[in-house]
Amino acid sequence: MINIGIHGASGKMGQMIINCLKDSKDAKLTALYTIEPLGSVPEGVIVTDDLNELFANCDVVIDFTIKEGALNLINYARTNPKPLVIGTTGLGDDGTNLLNLAANAMPILYATNMSLGVAVLNRLASLAAKTLAEFDIEIVEQHHRHKKDAPSGTALTLAQHAANARGLNLKDVIVTGRDGLVGARSKDEIAVLAVRGGDVVGRHTIGFYNEGEFIEINHTATSRATFAKGAIKAAVWLSSQKNGLYSIYDCLGL
């Protein structure tokens, strides 16, 4: 049984992880970090706005915050090593560089999406992108109206898998919007388009289009619980790993 600390306990994902930990046989909640008031808290769980106290009362920290919060956590952990599961998206190149540096001192699992279904979707996308080399690739992602980053980290990861499968640099071929007289689509272009509205938890579709036929592969999340359970599984797995930067594929053995 490992002790879990949550960084970003007042957020939607933090609250979902708290709820899912109630039924876990492998992990228990021991500490919550938040700068905002919380409602009811399980008995015996420490609530704090001090990273020192958070780290002192758990074996693994799970982070679902915003870019600034996640980077601050990772920087702190560089001198106070603790296994970290980072689920915050939109970290950018500076965040990626920091993750690689910090992973020399502790095990870190970083994933833009913690669901098993999305992990398989990425593998299928790689296979299709390589096999269907003449097909055009378009990605559409849909999320609730409150999501702050676009395109989603999951969609960008999906695009990265497709680009890698074709030996392309994603930065050279990605298109995140079209407007006006843009001309014909280029051969290597990978479009990633974002839809925002309502309470959509998450829906990602990658399409492969050719003359006479097309294939679309879709993943729809109907509850944040799928991400929460994935993060808990990742935390349990990470607790016994050596220093290094890991992905959800390492955890799932994919």
UniProtKB/Swiss-Prot annotation:
Its EC number is 1.17.1.8. NAD(+) binds at residues 8-13, 87-89, 111-114. Coiled coil: none annotated. (S)-2,3,4,5-tetrahydrodipicolinate binds at residues 144, 153-154. It is an enzyme of class 1 (oxidoreductase). GO terms for cellular component: cytosol. The keyword NAD applies. Pathway: Amino-acid biosynthesis; L-lysine biosynthesis via DAP pathway; (S)-tetrahydrodipicolinate from L-aspartate: step 4/4. It comes from the Bacteria. Keywords: Amino-acid biosynthesis, Cytoplasm, Diaminopimelate biosynthesis, Lysine biosynthesis, NAD, NADP, Oxidoreductase. One of its GO terms (molecular function) is NADP binding. It catalyses: (S)-2,3,4,5-tetrahydrodipicolinate + NAD(+) + H2O = (2S,4S)-4-hydroxy-2,3,4,5-tetrahydrodipicolinate + NADH + H(+); (S)-2,3,4,5-tetrahydrodipicolinate + NADP(+) + H2O = (2S,4S)-4-hydroxy-2,3,4,5-tetrahydrodipicolinate + NADPH + H(+). GO terms for biological process: diaminopimelate biosynthetic process; lysine biosynthetic process via diaminopimelate. It is found in: Cytoplasm. The active site is at 143 (proton donor/acceptor), 147 (proton donor). The keyword Isomerase does not apply. InterPro entries: DapB_C, DapB_N, DapB_N_CS, DHDPR_bac, NAD(P)-bd_dom_sf. Signal peptide: none annotated. Pfam families: DapB_C (PF05173), DapB_N (PF01113). PANTHER family: 4-HYDROXY-TETRAHYDRODIPICOLINATE REDUCTASE 1, CHLOROPLASTIC-RELATED, DIHYDRODIPICOLINATE REDUCTASE. Belongs to the DapB family. Catalyzes the conversion of 4-hydroxy-tetrahydrodipicolinate (HTPA) to tetrahydrodipicolinate. This is 4-hydroxy-tetrahydrodipicolinate reductase. It comes from Campylobacter curvus (strain 525.92). The gene is dapB.
